[in-house]
Amino acid sequence: MNPAEWIEGYRRAWEERDPEAAAALFTEDASYRSSPFREPPNLGHEGVVAYWTGATSSQEDVQVEMGEPLVDGNHAAVEWWTRMRNEGEEITLVGCLLLRFAPDGRCEDLREYWNFESGLLPPHEGWGSWRRR
C-alpha cells in the first residue's frame, strides 16, 4: 500500500464510519494522536477502533475531501476537508494528518491537527494542493 492508497482508505473508512476499516490501516502497535493535547494517544488497533467508534457515532452524511499529499520517504502530510452533520448540526472540520508508515504501508504514527466551523463550507481556492502555480 502506498501513501495515496492509504489516504483513500482513510477517507473511505471515515465516510462509511467504519472503525474496523480504519484500524486495518494501522500497525498493531500504532500511535494515533487525534489532537496534540490528547494524552495518552490512542494505541494499536483497539485504540483506533475505540476512538473511531466514539468519534463517528454521532456523525451523519460525512463527505471527506483529501488534498494532494506531500510524501518524503516513509512520511506524508495531507490536508483534509470534511462536511457532515454531527448530532444534527451541520459542521465543517478542516485538518491535516502527519503520517509515518511502516515498510508494509500501514501507518505506525498519526498526528492530527484540525479546526471546527459551523455550517457546510466549501474548500477555498487552492486548498489541498501544494503545487507551485
List PLM regions with ranges:
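Short, low-complexity N-terminal intrinsically disordered segments enriched in polar/charged residues
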Residues: 1-28, 128-133
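A beta-strand edge to alpha-helix "cap/lid" segment located at domain peripheries
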Residues: 2, 53-133
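A structural signal for well-ordered alpha-helical scaffolds and beta->alpha junctions
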Residues: 3, 7, 45-48, 92
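Hydrophobic alpha-helical core bundles mediating ligand binding, dimerization, or RNAP-core interactions
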Residues: 7-10, 14, 26, 48, ...
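Hydrophobic pocket/interface hotspot
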Residues: 10, 22-23, 30, 44, ...
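A solvent-exposed, acidic/Ser-Thr-rich amphipathic alpha-helical stretch
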Residues: 16, 20-73
